[in-house]
């Protein structure tokens, strides 16, 4: 149960990263409060999908891509093609940062790459470090 709450926290962090990325790079269609609410609501749906699919990586990747495309289309002035392109960039950065941190922990601690599924301490460490790295990567894509 505690791990579910941490995953919810991670999804909220990802919602804010998507909000920052799209609103920093495109003209806003929604006021900040509504835009943040839309992002959090969409990512909450992603969190529910994550619970239902038992953290299936491929389903989660597809869900996040769809969430980011929908969020971009409703919150900023962007074409569908650009929304898909930029959502794919966000997805790739998120996936790469998570995989990078999981690989480092797997190598250094001599644990399975998906040890976060069964070890709450590893989940917290990998989750926080990968999201900080994700935020940094997203922030530096458009200096």
Name each model feature, range by range.
Residues 64-73, 90-95:
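Alpha-helical transmembrane segments and their membrane-interface exit regions
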Residues 141-142:
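Conserved small/polar residues in nucleotide/adenosyl-binding loops
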Residues 1-14:
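Hydrophobic transmembrane alpha-helical segments in integral membrane proteins
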Residues 38-53:
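A generic, lipid-embedded transmembrane alpha helix
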